[in-house]
């Protein structure tokens, strides 16, 4: 059975596969981030959102995986076999867990549409030959700026690429003024 854990969120395993494995923080850092930002919602008996539920399930899955790893470490006599199991878990399962945690934390932090836009932007950037692409990859934390603009101007067509840093800087004072007017309403 081929199950894509991102499908119901509008993404795919392939879309996340464009991000290199060293892009994702460690599981420990991601768990600390999830706890710091969303502990109350994650521990709540009430349903918050599908991303909270997926995050809970991923955290529980990681806990079970660590229980299994501990059992293997304590019960597998052959050091070579034990190392093979540990390396497989760290390389394959660890990466999948890091991807899931990153995706759902990012969706809760920046919004699903922004994360999907980032994944598409990064996928286009990474597949463009180096001679024809900007030197720096898109940055997720800069995309909410364009998302805010898009939400205010619903009649406009959505942006298809991340603006250049020079363009972003020149627009930010104007954006700040319009945001302050909105907050006064």
Curated annotation (Swiss-Prot):
Annotated segments matching region RNA binding: 179-185
Q: Kindly list the positions at which Phosphoserine occurs in this protein.
A: 157, 164, 172
**One Pfam family it belongs to:** Hepatitis_core
User: What is one GO cellular-component annotation here?
Assistant: T=4 icosahedral viral capsid
Q: Superkingdom of this entry's organism?
A: Viruses
* One GO MF term: DNA binding
| UniProt-listed GO biological process terms | microtubule-dependent intracellular transport of viral material towards nucleus; symbiont entry into host cell; viral penetration into host nucleus
Q: Which positions does the motif Bipartite nuclear localization signal occupy?
A: 160-177
UniProt keywords, alphabetically: Capsid protein, Cytoplasmic inwards viral transport, DNA-binding, Host cytoplasm, Host-virus interaction, Microtubular inwards viral transport, Phosphoprotein, Repeat, RNA-binding, T=4 icosahedral capsid protein, Viral penetration into host nucleus, Virion, Virus entry into host cell
Q: Where are the sequence repeats?
A: 157-163, 164-171, 172-179
Q: What is its main location?
A: virion
Give residue spans, biased composition: Basic residues: 149-178
Q: Where is this region: 3 X 8 AA repeats of S-P-R-R-R-[PR]-S-Q?
A: 157-179
What is this protein's function per UniProt? Self assembles to form an icosahedral capsid. Most capsids appear to be large particles with an icosahedral symmetry of T=4 and consist of 240 copies of capsid protein, though a fraction forms smaller T=3 particles consisting of 180 capsid proteins. Entering capsids are transported along microtubules to the nucleus. Phosphorylation of the capsid is thought to induce exposure of nuclear localization signal in the C-terminal portion of the capsid protein that allows binding to the nuclear pore complex via the importin (karyopherin-) alpha and beta.
- Known partners and oligomeric status: Homodimerizes, then multimerizes. Interacts with cytosol exposed regions of viral L glycoprotein present in the reticulum-to-Golgi compartment. Interacts with human FLNB. Phosphorylated form interacts with host importin alpha; this interaction depends on the exposure of the NLS, which itself depends upon genome maturation and/or phosphorylation of the capsid protein. Interacts with host NUP153.
Quote the protein name from its UniProt record. Answer: Capsid protein
| Organism of provenance | Hepatitis B virus genotype A1 subtype adw2 (isolate South Africa/84/2001) (HBV-A)
């Amino acid at each position: 059975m081929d199950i894509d854990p991102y499908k119901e969120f509008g993404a795919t395993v392939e879309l996340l596969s464009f991000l290199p494995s060293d892009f994702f923080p460690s599981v420990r850092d991601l768990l600390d981030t999830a706890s710091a930002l969303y502990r109350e919602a994650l521990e709540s008996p009430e349903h918050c959102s599908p991303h909270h539920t997926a995050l809970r399930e991923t955290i529980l899955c990681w806990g079970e995986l660590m229980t299994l790893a501990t059992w293997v470490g304590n019960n597998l006599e052959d050091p070579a076999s034990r190392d093979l199991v540990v390396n497989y878990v760290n390389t394959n399962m660890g990466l999948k867990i890091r991807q899931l945690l990153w995706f759902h934390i990012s969706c809760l932090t920046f919004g699903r549409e922004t994360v999907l836009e980032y994944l598409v932007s990064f996928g286009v950037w990474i597949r463009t030959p180096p001679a024809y692409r900007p030197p720096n990859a898109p940055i997720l934390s800069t995309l909410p700026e364009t998302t805010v603009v898009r939400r205010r101007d619903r009649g406009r067509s959505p942006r298809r690429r991340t603006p250049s840093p020079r363009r972003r800087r020149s627009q930010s004072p104007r954006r700040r003024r319009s945001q302050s007017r909105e907050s006064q309403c």
